[in-house]
């Protein structure tokens, strides 16, 4: 005797058969089949190389503007500008250990200078001007409060977070023994800051009053940078060559790489990465951009590459 599920399946088959003879319905079925095929291909997060190898210094921060241009610092003298199609040019020069960066509310690029203990402002034409020249100690990651315009900088050498007012005044915002070369820094949508350490595998939460607390443990080694997109953080595991996703409740999931170093495009654990560091989100779609250090830390010339991550479909 047929059960309810059998009746439902039989009804579906009859409707499917009658639909097949309708040209409009066949067109709809074709569209749906293409959508399902696309969804199956995009079932896993995947990565592809966006640029050819760039000869330079090393890997600093990455940020993306509102029209999709990617700005990549080389931890040396330069910031590169790369279009979403992969065309690249030098955007700015004359920096001193160009590390983390972010675009402020005026559309200018704020660029940390690790060796110069400073932050510079770079306009849309690539003109570099000093912004902060004192009060920082090995600045790396930059995060901006979009409501106030205040800037927060991770001081790697100083194991602290500095706050920079819109007029350039620097004050101490957070200091803790939990910091171990704080490197990447990002806001959530509630005004909390999140920081990842370069010298260990800890992700920390800093509340709006500057109180620091453990948040998540990621991978087994030091971390690079992080970005926040659609209620998720995406973190580069610099020393273990992986990318991780972290939810707002602290759940950690590896989405790219298997811990083995290399430059291999692909999905999930089949992809290979090489010292991924900077990471930033595209203004549209589920895309991220990272930079990676291609050669060994001692070999010359130093070379880097920029790659695009396409996140799996939202669940």
Predicted regions and their residues:
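Structural WD40 beta-propeller signal
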Residues: 65, 104, 145-147, 188, ...
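Short loop/turn segments that connect beta-strands within beta-propeller blades
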Residues: 82-87, 122-127, 164-169, 206-211, ...
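Bacterial N-terminal signal peptides
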Residues: 27-37
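Gly/Pro-rich loop segments of beta-rich domains
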Residues: 45-60, 71, 75, 86-99, ...
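Short glycine/acidic-enriched loop and turn motifs that connect beta-strands
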Residues: 77-78, 116-117, 158-159, 200-201, ...
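Conserved beta-propeller blade signature
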Residues: 69-71, 108-111, 150-152, 192-195, ...
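Blade-level signature of beta-propeller repeat domains, shared across WD40, Kelch, NHL, RCC1
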Residues: 275-315
């Amino acid at each position: 005797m047929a059960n309810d599920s059998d009746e439902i399946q039989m009804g579906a088959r009859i409707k499917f058969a009658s639909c097949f003879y309708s040209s409009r319905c066949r067109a709809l079925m074709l569209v749906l089949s293409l959508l399902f095929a696309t969804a199956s291909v995009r079932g896993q997060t995947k990565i592809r190389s966006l640029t050819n190898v760039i000869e330079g210094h090393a890997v600093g921060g990455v940020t993306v503007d509102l029209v999709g241009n990617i700005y990549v610092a080389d931890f040396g003298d330069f910031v590169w500008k790369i279009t979403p199609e992969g065309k690249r040019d030098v955007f700015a020069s004359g920096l001193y250990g160009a590390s983390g960066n972010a675009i402020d509310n005026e559309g200018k690029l704020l660029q940390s200078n690790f060796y110069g203990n400073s932050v510079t402002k770079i306009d849309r034409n690539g003109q570099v001007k000093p912004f902060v020249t004192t009060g920082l100690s090995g600045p790396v990651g930059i995060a901006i409060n979009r409501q106030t315009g205040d800037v927060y900088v991770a001081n790697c050498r100083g194991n602290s977070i500095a706050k920079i007012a819109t007029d350039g005044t620097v004050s101490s915002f957070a200091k803790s023994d939990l910091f171990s070369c704080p490197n990447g820094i990002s806001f959530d949508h509630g005004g909390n800051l999140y920081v990842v350490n370069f010298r260990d595998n800890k992700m920390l939460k800093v509340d709006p009053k500057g109180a620091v607390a453990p948040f998540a443990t990621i991978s087994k080694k030091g971390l690079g940078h992080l970005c926040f997109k659609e209620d998720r953080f995406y973190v580069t595991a610099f020393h273990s060559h992986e990318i991780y996703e972290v939810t707002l409740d602290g759940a950690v999931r590896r989405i790219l790489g298997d811990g083995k170093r290399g430059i291999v495009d692909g999905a999930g654990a089949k992809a290979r990465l090489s010292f991924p560091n900077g990471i930033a989100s595209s203004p549209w779609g589920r895309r991220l951009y990272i930079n990676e250090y291609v050669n060994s830390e001692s070999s010359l010339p130093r070379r880097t590459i920029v790659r695009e991550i396409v996140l799996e479909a939202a669940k």
